[in-house]
Design a protein with these regions (language model features):
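Active-site helix/loop module of the DD-peptidase/beta-lactamase fold
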Residues: 40-44, 48, 56-92, 102, ...
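Glycosyltransferase-associated regions of secretory-pathway enzymes
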Residues: 21-23, 64-68, 139, 201-206, ...
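A short, well-structured edge-of-sheet supersecondary motif
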Residues: 2-41, 80, 205, 233-237, ...
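Active-site Gly/Thr loop motif
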Residues: 147, 153, 179-239
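Short clusters of small/polar residues that mark proteolytic maturation junctions
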Residues: 31-33, 67, 228, 248
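Active-site-proximal alpha-helical segments within enzyme catalytic domains
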Residues: 47-51, 106-113, 147-169, 176, ...
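Structured C-terminal helix/loop/strand segments within mature extracytoplasmic catalytic/sensor domains
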Residues: 223-271
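Flexible glycine/proline-enriched surface loops and loop-helix/loop-strand junctions
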Residues: 33-36, 93-96, 107, 141-145
Length: 271
């Protein structure tokens, strides 16, 4: 089986795009474009960083509810964007747990916390904990664990298969990560405005009933993943039992809000 829908990226107004679709067992259902090319991930870095944090949790290096970040916040708050930290500044704008304030600063403080707990620089810890075991040789998380990752469609398909059928983590840990943290919390979904609630798991955004949204109209409410400002996304739809990755070299904007949902709907209609 080779999906024809992935070729729809040819219609996107971008210089370069690559995409792929994968099942939980690692079966790649279709790819299109330069899937071995390395693209800046922007915020698609966050799911990789979050997965490394969950490995650190299972190894006993950190606890989800231990203090981390600003006063009163925990590792869980940082992963779920409820620490109260501002978007790109290391200052608080709300008490922990009160609002879903999407925060790059929160993931940077999370990386610092894990580096201190493990005595390993976070990028190296992530390489040892996640990238190397999954064979993601073309992926790096140097710089900010919120936004500076670089990867390929091929590598991210390996990661998406892992999240669907975990080998590095207990499946119960992954299930908890895809469960809404601090239910009912409202906030802004970058690029899509205010959402009430703005549901999030541990490092992964959860679609639920959000509208508008970057996934498709036919995406199940349980769909989770992330998109990045560099024109990238990764989603996993547990009901469809499939995951999709798309990477481009054009920044997110109205073109993406228009092109991505029908692309996702076409993929889901074909699997």
């Amino acid at each position: 089986m080779s999906l024809k829908s992935v070729a729809l990226i040819e219609n996107w107004p971008v210089p370069t795009a690559a995409a792929g679709v994968v099942r939980a067992d690692g079966t790649v259902l279709g790819t299109h474009g330069p899937v071995g090319r390395r693209f800046p991930l922007a915020s698609v870095t966050k799911p990789l960083a979050a997965y490394a944090a969950l490995v650190a949790y299972e190894e006993g290096a950190i606890e989800l509810d231990e203090p981390a970040g600003p006063p009163g916040a925990t590792v869980r708050h940082l992963l779920a964007h409820t620490s109260g930290l501002a978007f790109d500044e290391h200052r608080t704008t709300a008490p922990p747990g009160e609002r879903r304030l999407y925060s790059n600063a929160g993931f940077e403080q999370l990386g610092d916390h894990i580096a201190k707990a493990t005595d390993i620089p976070f990028a190296e810890y992530a390489r040892q904990a996640v990238l190397e075991p999954l064979g993601m040789a073309d992926t790096t998380l140097d710089g900010s664990p919120a936004k500076d990752g670089v990867s390929t469609v091929e590598d991210l398909l390996r990661f998406a298969a892992e999240v669907q059928a975990p080998r590095l983590l207990d499946p119960r840990t992954v299930a908890a990560a895809m469960t809404v943290q601090h239910p009912g919390t409202k906030g802004v979904l970058p690029g899509y405005g205010h959402q009430n609630p703005n549901d999030w798991g541990l490092g992964f955004e959860i679609r639920d009933a959000k509208s508008p949204h970057w996934t498709g109209a036919s995406s199940s409410p349980r769909t989770f993943g992330h998109f990045g400002q560099s024109g990238t996304f990764l989603w996993i739809d547990p009901d469809a039992r499939v995951a999709c990755v798309a990477l481009t070299d054009r920044a997110f904007g109205p073109w993406a809000a228009e092109a991505w949902p029908p692309f996702t709907d076409a993929v889901l209609a074909e699997v």
